[in-house]
Amino acid sequence: MKAKMKKHACTYPGCSKAFTRAEHLRRHSLNHETISNSQGYTCQRCMTHFSRADLLSRHLDRHAKKDAEAGGFGKGVLETRKRMRRAEDGSIVLRPPKRPSRHQQKTGPPVGAPLSSSGSVSAGSGRSSRSPDVSLHAAQAPVSPPRSASDPVSVSGVSIDDDGTDPDPMLAPMMPGGPFEPYVEPIPGQFDAADGSWGGFDALGDGMMLDTATDFNLPFAATGNYNWLFDVSSLDDAFHHLELPLGPDLVPFANSHGNYASVNTMELSGAGAENVQDSMLNLDLDIDLNGLPAGFVHDQGPDGSSASVLLQAASFVERGNINGSDPKRDFPDLDWMAGAPPIESTVPLRPQLSEDARRGILTLIAQSPPVDIHGQPLNLDSPLLSLSALQSYSDLFFSRFNTTYPLIHSATFDPNKTEPVFLASILSMGATYSSREAHQLAVGIHDGLRNQLFCHGAFSPQPDELWVLQAMLLIDCFGKMRAGPKQRERAQLFHCVLIKLIRRSTCCSIRADTHSDPGLGGLELEDAWKRAMDAEQRKRLAFQCFMWDTEHSVLFSQSLCMSAFEIRSSLPCSPAAWEAHTAEEWSRHASRDTEHAFLPVLKGYITPGSVSRPRDLNRFSRMVVLHGLMSISADLKRRDQTTLRAETPERVGAWTPRMGRAYDLWKADFDADCLNMKLGPVQVSADETRRFTSLKAAAMALYRAASLALHVEVLDLQIAAGASHILGRVVKQHDRERSRVMLSRWLSGPSPAATTASRHAAALLQDAVLSLHDWDQTDAFHFPWCLYLATLTVWAFHAREGCVPKPTDLSSLIVAMTTSNAADLEGLAGQYDTRPLIRAMAQQLATVRWAVVHDAMKVLLNLGV
């Protein structure tokens, strides 16, 4: 089939190459013209030799670009992967790579030394020779001056050969799912990436972009982005060898305080990977290590390596508690569903509002006054708008919202010098954590804020003011996750406007070192602190917008608007540096921070063998990385849905196991980080403990839901369960019938997708039920929606035709599903009555003030009848 599609055959004598497009044949023919008519071309700066003049011209352009970036002619350093060089005697040689590639280690012959007039370079097994006689006229060629760089850099430590032995990893397949054609070189802009530096974070901008159109039309991830991320020459090659270790480096974490639990190295390969993945599903960090048996030893994997102490201890204690009589795990009634009283959160700094700030807010509200419950304009003398009330909204924003989503730097934020529209967006968000009346007031204020912001003089298509973007992000978040359907639909319309403005700013590429100079003091140090925090807020704004966009794509099946590849910033700074009250305190903490670029860290989880994962990531950075993995999964899913797979239908979803392992590797690191905090010698405050508990619950819920979404279409779950509206569209009967058919195939299919998704769902519900006293401390907006998806998954798993489920209480259902292995769980499908679980979750979701969750609650109520 593929041979018939290659209609454009090369007519050069002895060449049997054929191509799918005429343009590919035209570029290929240039190689034959070079053999017949030219002696080759040599760069006079670095002695790199090319077979074609157009390739040399592009190479010289890159020299000029590097010189311009370095500040003058001859100052730029261009590191190229091309290994064909002109030696001092005029002959053409191939410089050997730093280390052989994986392909060469297995089958490829060693690269030769100088090329003789009678020799040629093999283009690989089954390929015709294409190298010209390059040394025939070598003595006549000009001698080049000293080169501009040393040895060529490599992609993930593998030097890439340009003669066809190893395909260039930045060259994309010419056809979806089709063969890679190494002679088709180069698509404009691809050679820029191949000749750029891959040695460090500073070079990501050059290496990741294939062409100008890609650079200016994000967020669409190009093939080269994925080739780099998965460390392959073609994305189709990324998922063929899943039996190889994908997570080999669970090594001990560095301990800044001197005391950590030991975590042994573990290989995730073969059958051992399944065992480890099963253990990861059942991790629970409420661990008393003294309860382990005296004879507790490390289980040996199939290769003799020790498994992780962390994973074994957690899974052992989980099983022990379930079989024991822990009162927290007995559920005689559902009193816990009534919810705990609001916690008294405290924060180190609470910006204080003045009467002038209040007058600015009232003036803004008067331009578009909200209405009360009777439909009358709200009186500006209302107690809900008093100075004390506004101050309470501000306190709630910084103690609840800004703790979960650290966007605004409270130490440098002055509400009395802030634009009223920005301050109003902060206060309205804080009011949603107050009484229902205050929440209703906030919704009314919100309805006019977007117009007020668009009409402000500081708003422009090229925003310079940070507060404009911050206000727009808060307004977008409020409309989507803190209000009703009308506000949500409006927010959806303007979501892409926000992303476009962020792209036009510098927020996605904050690379400046935020460390302080030890020699600074006084006003200089104060200015350095404010500049660093301004950059940090810009960075966090882009990250948070990216995270919310990713959540809505994965958890709601909405279109992904941002790509992980457009985030070129370093990860957020440490909480200590972020929460410092003074410039001196910030300087002390920032000097100990280590910057980590987002994309290389992300690659460390997807392709563990290529990049080492940093062990000193803070918890917010770990959440960013998880969202990066989710974004990659969502985009790969989109590629499956939009790529023509007529020839390779087996590759649809082939990425799922690898991304699932990346999720599990992230969880193992997160668990080890949490365990260290729990067992470390440093005592933390009660407020820090509450924040840690909230973050842990939110992170685990998101991990479970993201893993669940890998194996089931969440829209099918909602539609089959009875949702009346999805993404603003009315669900019709044929939609419901289609979703039920899809779920039936999902349940009865040969793959373990249904079992895997159900195990993640049950684990998520177990975590929620066991965190009885921590429910109200989880301010993450995604948490109730994750519970809803998990409940629907368990319902679908047991709602099989022809099965008569037996009456089951909530605790028995959860325990049965979380303590069974994959094979046993498959046999339990359709055996349990899920109505007690559905009713319990519906009762809990009824307490959430979010229209989307309210609709979800109504779906559960209908299912629980």
UniProtKB/Swiss-Prot annotation:
The gene is hxnR. Residues 96-105 have a biased composition (Basic residues). Keywords: Metal-binding, Nucleus, Repeat, Zinc, Zinc-finger. InterPro entries: Transcription_factor_dom_fun, VerF-like, Znf_C2H2_sf, Znf_C2H2_type. Residues 78-89 have a biased composition (Basic and acidic residues). GO terms for molecular function: DNA-binding transcription factor activity, RNA polymerase II-specific; RNA polymerase II cis-regulatory region sequence-specific DNA binding; zinc ion binding. PANTHER family: MIP31509P (PTHR40626), NICOTINATE CATABOLISM CLUSTER-SPECIFIC TRANSCRIPTION FACTOR (PTHR40626:SF18). A zinc finger (C2H2-type) spans 8-32, 41-63. The keyword S-adenosyl-L-methionine does not apply. Changing residue 639 to C: Leads to constitutive activator activity. The keyword Repeat applies. Transcription factor that specifically regulates the expression of the hxn gene cluster that mediates the degradation of nicotinate and related metabolites. Induction: Expression is induced by nicotinate and 6-OH nicotinate and is subject to nitrogen metabolite repression mediated by the GATA factor areA. Changing residue 228 to R/S: Leads to constitutive activator activity. A motif (Nuclear localization signal(NLS)) lies at residues 77-87. One of its GO terms (cellular component) is nucleus. This is Nicotinate catabolism cluster-specific transcription factor. A motif (Nuclear export signal (NES)) lies at residues 285-289. Residues 108-132 have a biased composition (Low complexity). Disruption phenotype: Leads to the inability to use nicotinate, 6-OH nicotinic acid, and 2,5-dihydroxypyridine as sole nitrogen sources. It is found in: Nucleus. GO terms for biological process: DNA-templated transcription; regulation of transcription by RNA polymerase II. Residues 74-168 are annotated as: Disordered. It comes from Emericella nidulans (strain FGSC A4 / ATCC 38163 / CBS 112.46 / NRRL 194 / M139). SUPFAM superfamilies: beta-beta-alpha zinc fingers.
